[in-house]
Amino acid sequence: MTKEFHHVTVLLHETIDMLDVKPEGIYVDATLGGAGHSEYLLSKLSEKGHLYAFDQDQNAIDNAQKRLAPYIEKGMVTFIKDNFRHLQARLREAGVQEIDGICYDLGVSSPQLDQRERGFSYKKDAPLDMRMNQDASLTAYEVVNHYDYHDLVRIFFKYGEDKFSKQIARKIEQAREVKPIETTTELAEIIKLVKPAKELKKKGHPAKQIFQAIRIEVNDELGAADESIQQAMDMLALDGRISVITFHSLEDRLTKQLFKEASTVEVPKGLPFIPDDLKPKMELVSRKPILPSAEELEANNRSHSAKLRVVRKIHK
């Protein structure tokens, strides 16, 4: 039985419109989720166009099959249940050598946060899980109860950027010596015990950064995004585009760096021309990230941290 995906798509029109969709093109939605981006992209394709939609969450695919039924009947959609880090291999298996555009909506989706049993949210009591792919072996429970102190500190600093990482890791160590930490609420309460009163008064939940860090570790989110975006740049046809929505500084920093490296070139001074093999492959479509409009911010609180970056392929 599938769980309904109630998901408000962020930066919907901006993300797809910036792809400059060709009606007969081949496109990829690397993060199907609630299928909002997929549905809007498909509305711009003719029946000769095609969309490949990736998601490692079976619930997302099951629900998208209902939402996108009219396009499925026309043979315009292929679903791929896999991590988008396998983008190139899975598209090659499907006989695709080049794509005209691809969009990414990074991070956890609203339905995953809202489904209590998935264990993503510090606001809802549930077993520690946080797997985007329910078939994966590593869970938040494993990280919290079996990672040693130094590994916990590493991921809390690296992926959560929490200045109380050492104290939180130590408190977790002490708590699990008494009994395993089994639920999201238990973990959130342990984190609260460490944070000083002035931190608890700040806007936002005190456990937010640590939960983010554990989720990124469980799903290797940054590693997967790095690999996938680089593969996407290789597979783009000339004039093809990549749209990437990020929701926190780590994702945005990674995307910005990948796009910068692909769109700039350093050549020795005095060269009369830039050799073809040194020319940048990509061009920034927008130098600054595109942000949600005031109307979207008012309608959807979860869009407040979203940033959209776009590049275009200019050289093979």
Swiss-Prot record:
EC number: 2.1.1.199
GO molecular function: rRNA (cytosine-N4-)-methyltransferase activity
Catalytic activity field: cytidine(1402) in 16S rRNA + S-adenosyl-L-methionine = N(4)-methylcytidine(1402) in 16S rRNA + S-adenosyl-L-homocysteine + H(+)
Protein name: Ribosomal RNA small subunit methyltransferase H
Localization (cell): Cytoplasm
Domain of life: Bacteria
InterPro entries for this protein: RsmH, SAM-dep_MeTrfase_MraW_recog, SAM-dependent_MTases_sf
Disulfide bonds: none
Cytoplasm found in the keyword field: yes
Alphabetized UniProt keyword annotations: Cytoplasm, Methyltransferase, rRNA processing, S-adenosyl-L-methionine, Transferase
Function text: Specifically methylates the N4 position of cytidine in position 1402 (C1402) of 16S rRNA.
GO cellular component: cytoplasm
Binding site for S-adenosyl-L-methionine: A35, G36, H37, D55, F84, D105, Q112
Family to which the UniProt record says this protein belongs: Belongs to the methyltransferase superfamily. RsmH family.
A GO BP entry: rRNA base methylation
